[in-house]
Every structure is written in C-alpha cells, then in structure tokens.
Amino acid sequence: MAPETEAFDVVIIGGGPGGYAAALYGASAGLSVAMIEMEKVGGTCLHRGCIPAKEFLETAAVWRTVASAAEFGVSAEAPTLDFAVSQARKQSVVDLLTKGLTGVLANRSVTVLSGRGRLTAPGQVTVTEGIDAGRCVIAPSIILATGSVPRTLPGLEVDGQLVVTSDEFLDLDHLPSSAAVVGGGAIGCEFASMLSDLGVAVTIVEGLPTILAACDADVVAQISRSFKKRKIAMITSAVVTGHTRGSSGSSTALAIEGRESLEVEMIVVSVGRRPLTDGVVDPAIGVEIDDRGFIVADGRMRTAATGVWAVGDVVAGTPQLAHVAFAEAMVAIKDILGEEPTPVDYLRVPWAIYCHPEVAFAGLTEAQAIEMGYDVVTKKDPFGGNGRARIIGDTEGMVKVVAARGPDGRAGQVLGVHMVGPWVTEQLGAGYLAVNWEALVDEVAGLIQPHPSLSETFGETMIALTGRGLHVG
C-alpha cells in the first residue's frame, strides 16, 4: 500500500543554512513549507562548523586578553585552560541557538520531518530513514539543500583520536600538546590559530604553494608573518602520503613526501568538504550531478529538472559559505514566486576568516583584477597608525583596496577590499557595499568614519586613493 501523501507548496531536503533559510523565507511569503532534516536543524554550521568553531576561537581570544592584562595595569595570574568548561559553554551556545531556530520554524508553521529525504519522483519526496521514515510529501517546488561533510585524504583515515576532521575536533574532551593541521585554507588557519593561542605546538601542512590561496597576496604575506611570529610552522607544496601510529598509541608520524616525518599527537584534516548528494535524487528525475558529486544549478538556483532547485554546499562552483547559502535560498524562493531574482554574484560575496589576526574580503584580489584585464590602482594602510587599534593593543594587519584606473588616470571603481586585523570581519560591511554597488573611490572616500574607530583605516585608505591623503600618503 502506497504511503499517504501530504501536500505543500515547497518541500526542502536538508535543514542547514540553505534549507532552513529557504523554509523561513518561503513561509514568510505565505508558502506552505515542509523541511526534512536527518539530524538537527541548523546543519553543519550550527552544530559542527561555524558556531562551535568560533566559540573556541573566542576562548582563544579571552586567553590572549588575560595573558596581556599586565600591559593595561591589570594584575592577573597566568591563564590556564579547563577545556571541559570551554566545551560546555560551546554546547550551551549551540543548544540555545538550536532552540531559537526550532521555535522560529514552528512560529512560521514550517513542518519539520526527521529523517533522510529522497526525491523519488517529480514533485515527490519520501522520508527513507529516521523518526518519520515512510512519510511522503509532495509539492510543485522542491529545494535540495543537503549540505556537505569534511573530505579526507588517502592514508589519513579518521579515527576520532589521532586523526580528526572538524566534526570530531569540535567534540574533543582535551587538547593535544602538538598538532599537524593538514590544509591551510580558511578552516585550517582558524584551527591552527586557535590551537596555537591555547598552547599547542602547531604545524600547517598545505599542498599548494601558499596558505590561504584564495586571498590577496598581501593578505597571505601578513598572515604568514603573524603565524611565524607566533611559532606556527608552515610547510607548503607538501604531498601527504599517510601516517604511522606510534607504539604508545598517543602520537603519530605524518609522512610528507621528500621530508622527514612530522611527529604529533593529533592530525587535523582540513582539506575541504564534499557534497552530500548520494541517494538524494532518483537519477530518472534528471537533476544533473557533476563528477565530484555537486549539483549543477543556474543563476536562479534551478537544476536541470523542472521544479527542482538546489542551494548551499551542494551547488557546483560556488563558495561553501553559510551566508552564500542564505542568499541562494532567497533567490530560489523568489524564483518559485515568479519574482525574477537577481543571481548571487559569487565574485563579490563577503569572506570572513576568524584566525588571529582576522581576515575579511570582498571582490577581486589584485592578481584577479589584472588577470581580468583591469588597469589597477591599489593602496594599503596598516592598523599600526590607527588610534583605536593602539588603544586595544591589537595593531597587526592592514586594509588594502583594489580599484580600476579611470580614464583620467585616477582610481575609479572599487573592485576589491581586503582586510587583515582586529575585528575586520565586523568591519567589512562598508567594503562589501562599495564593491557590490560598483562605487567609485571618490564616492566612498566622502563617507565619514567615526573617531576613534578601527573603521577609520578603511576610510583613510579610500581617501589616500583619491590622490590626497590625511594620515596615509
């Protein structure tokens, strides 16, 4: 006997940032929405990614503050870490946010089903596992938002003790004395920075010629200098071939081609994420999936199958960022509503990396702009001359602006804004607006920044690009 079906306007498979954002946005537009999630609403970002990772980075920031208290005339004992307390605080933050999200979904009348959703026929999703296994929902519009999981490398099989990914790391009950972070991208640098601040001897092992390969070269240089000063070792252009567990079982030797093995207590694998698309869609439906497992979608997030959209980490060729998933979710819902949405401009999305010092950027790097044919003008301003940075005792970093040279030879359209330094992840908003509104340097330079503030460095950089500087020449 076929299962009884329930009808909705939209059915979403996946309850992470892309899925729940689509659910909330669709429900606020008056659509009836069902969302199927196999674990907890909030997905990787809330439970095993953005939120818990930043909680531990905040623990590291508190450590740094206490360690430098004497500089401000405040007497404090040398800091010690009770990691169990840090874990408990992380979990309380996650639980509180999960409860809030669950409440918002309920208030918007979103039907949340627990289990693994599978698109079994056009417009029909069946729950195949979990509490609601066997239930069937139908809708004219289906959104695939099943997310991703950490990738691993051959020879680095995850055991949850000596070899971990972000999933296992964020649930550890203790920190190692030494660690190799395999992968020097955003997540790898965040883990390396946090571990180093908390007293762990860290080595970043990166396969590419540089860490943070997606960042502007001046940003990479600044972070590399900072990490070296903090004794974070970096091995680049590395080929990892495996590891050999020590006889005691408490350490392992990471094998790197052409180099001596690196003995550490833990290997943290941070080499990107793979999409969760296996078994999500019946092949006969016609959703195109590329050879890496990603779903192919157009600018409106439509897949090759009529009535099926995809958002978030599963989408081919897009940044795997929660805020990008939010934006894609809104595009998909607007398209379902027939509102002619503006596609996400992936070259201009904001990026935030929460290592110390922080990194934030939007738009083109200098190298990208030149490669695309622009005649560029750039300007850099260090935080060392910023009064607010001096006050808080955090002066590492700089702001760099990349602009197109106008017909008069002066800096014209703002192409990219790149920041390294204190709280730059909170400062990027003005730079992001400048890039996305295709603002001219003269226009942005006319905006007044409060004094004393960290954001003055962004303002001063823009003023200097006009050809007349204040504190910056």
Report residues per predicted region.
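FAD-site-proximal beta/loop scaffold in flavoenzymes
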Residues: 159-176, 261-338, 430
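Glycine-rich flavin
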Residues: 2-8, 24-31, 36-175, 203, ...
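A Rossmann-like FAD-binding core segment of flavoenzymes
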Residues: 111-114, 118-129, 198-299, 364, ...
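Beta1/beta-strand and adjacent pyrophosphate-binding region of the FAD-binding site
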Residues: 4-16, 175-185
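Flexible, glycine-rich terminal cap/loop adjacent to redox cofactors
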Residues: 11-18, 22, 27-39, 44, ...
